[in-house]
Amino acid sequence: MPIVLLGFMGVGKTTTAHLLNLPVYDMDHIIEERIGMPIADYFSLEGEASFRQLETEVLKGLLDLPSNCIVSTGGGVIKSEVNRELLLANREDNVLLTASFEVSYQRIRKDRQSQRPLFLQCSKEEFEALYRERMALYQGLADTVIDTDKLIPEQVARKILCK
């Protein structure tokens, strides 16, 4: 099974994945290719439930990949109970990247390339509630947990390669 990077928005999953010198399968990019539009647009047109169903289909396919690759998940992949069950079965190969709420919030705010629909729709307080809800769902899904608050992406990548 592949190494699967989990974590809330802004913890560095995509950035770190590309530093590991292995083939990278970014779930958000795969989904955008499949739907032919940015996720934010799909969210607006089809709603979150439709997006999560598509996300589950993509996750199932990616978990069947060989062990010499990286899967970078979307920040909300754990919202689906089906996805959490799939990830739990893969927990020894999962790496949970964490960051404090404030660090995640500032990283997302500064990221001009990614328009994250849930971030754009929420006040800071609502976004913090979302962060806390999702962090609780991540618990137990990965044997390896790395706090990225004070690490640069290269340090995070080294920790993953040494696991």
Curated annotation (Swiss-Prot):
Q: What class of enzyme is it?
A: transferase
In terms of domain of life, where is this protein from? Bacteria
Q: How is the cofactor bound?
A: Binds 1 Mg(2+) ion per subunit.
The family database entries (CDD domains) matched by this protein are listed as: SK
Question: EC?
Answer: 2.7.1.71
Q: Enumerate the residues binding ATP.
A: G10, V11, G12, K13, T14, T15, R116
Q: Write down the chemical reaction(s) this protein catalyses.
A: shikimate + ATP = 3-phosphoshikimate + ADP + H(+)
What residues does substrate bind to? D28, R52, G75, R134
GO CC list = cytosol
Do you know which InterPro entries this protein is assigned to?
P-loop_NTPase, Shikimate/glucono_kinase, Shikimate_kinase/TSH1, Shikimate_kinase_CS
Q: Which UniProt keywords apply?
A: Amino-acid biosynthesis, Aromatic amino acid biosynthesis, ATP-binding, Cytoplasm, Kinase, Magnesium, Metal-binding, Nucleotide-binding, Transferase
Q: Which GO terms describe its biological process?
A: amino acid biosynthetic process; aromatic amino acid family biosynthetic process; chorismate biosynthetic process
Residues the entry annotates as binding Mg(2+): T14
Cofactor section: Mg(2+)
Q: What is its main location?
A: cytoplasm
Against PROSITE patterns, the record matches this protein to: SHIKIMATE_KINASE
Location(s) in or outside the cell: Cytoplasm
Q: Which GO terms describe its molecular function?
A: ATP binding; magnesium ion binding; shikimate kinase activity
Q: Does the keyword Glycosyltransferase apply?
A: no
Q: In which pathway does it act?
A: Metabolic intermediate biosynthesis; chorismate biosynthesis; chorismate from D-erythrose 4-phosphate and phosphoenolpyruvate: step 5/7
Q: What does this protein do?
A: Catalyzes the specific phosphorylation of the 3-hydroxyl group of shikimic acid using ATP as a cosubstrate.
Q: Which family does it belong to?
A: Belongs to the shikimate kinase family.
How does this chain assemble?
Monomer.
- The entry's protein name is Shikimate kinase
Which organism does this sequence originate in? Answer: Streptococcus suis (strain 05ZYH33)
